[in-house]
């Protein structure tokens, strides 16, 4: 869910092994080609039931939303598969979804975020998905420019979920522990410390459920990797 604590506040292979096709490429990388990196962490597969549900929804729900995801990808330069994976993690691709905290639509936009992204009808898949894509791009632009993909994309997705302020807190904690605050694997390992008073008491934005955000990004990466098997429109083959 975007902007859970205010507006200050992206496979089954290892996270970051391949940036989803079409995601914004780092400097020096040809646009549209995947940026690759060594797997920063080793993680478990999707739970069997979740993987089964996801594959079923690729057949039943994704076709109704694919055009909005592809249009948002053209607008932002972020790969449609990554956007679709993010949307699935947020709402299970349900345009009428509403969270207990008031986030709405496919990309689970909070009302103030939707307004800032120019969304007038939050339950319109076209508007909501475009708004979510623009918000992710906004988060990516707020991640320090020196950080290259794929780390920058995963950090931006974490910020989409937890807010840029809490992400910066997690990066500071990572640095305190003499790890690399520009490397997603290191930040991911330290995100859970935002719920530990020994650490969040030393941060600007305080408590946050960082473990939830770490899993959020992991799920997005897993869904995006599975979506790599979905062919482009008009493509032949499996």
Predicted segments, located by residue:
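Catalytic glycan-binding domains that act on GlcNAc-containing polysaccharides
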Residues: 34-238
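Hydrophobic h-region of N-terminal signal peptides that target proteins for export
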Residues: 14-20
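N-terminal secretory signal peptides and thylakoid transit peptides that target proteins
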Residues: 1-14
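Catalytic-site microenvironment of enzymes
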Residues: 5-6, 26, 47
């Amino acid at each position: 869910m975007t902007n859970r604590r205010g507006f200050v506040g992206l496979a089954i292979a290892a996270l970051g092994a391949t940036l989803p096709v079409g995601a914004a490429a780092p400097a020096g990388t040809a646009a549209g080609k995947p940026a690759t990196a060594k797997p920063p962490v080793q993680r478990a597969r999707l739970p069997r039931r979740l993987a089964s549900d996801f594959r079923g929804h690729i057949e039943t729900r994704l076709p109704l939303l694919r055009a909005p995801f592809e249009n948002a990808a053209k607008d932002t330069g972020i790969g449609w598969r990554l956007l679709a994976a993010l949307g699935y993690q947020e709402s299970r691709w349900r345009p009428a979804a509403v969270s207990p905290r008031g986030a709405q639509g496919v990309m689970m936009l909070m009302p103030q975020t939707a307004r800032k992204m120019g969304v007038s009808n939050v339950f319109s898949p076209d508007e909501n998905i475009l708004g979510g894509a623009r918000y992710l791009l906004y988060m990516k632009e707020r991640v320090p420019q020196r950080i290259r993909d794929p780390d920058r994309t995963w950090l931006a997705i974490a910020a989409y979920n937890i807010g840029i302020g809490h992400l910066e807190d997690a990066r500071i904690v990572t640095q305190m522990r003499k790890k690399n605050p520009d490397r997603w694997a290191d930040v991911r390992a330290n995100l859970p410390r935002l719920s530990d008073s020994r650490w969040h008491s030393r941060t600007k934005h305080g408590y946050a459920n960082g473990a939830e955000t770490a899993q959020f990004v992991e799920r997005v990466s897993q869904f995006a990797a599975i979506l790599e098997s979905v062919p482009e429109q008009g493509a032949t083959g499996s």
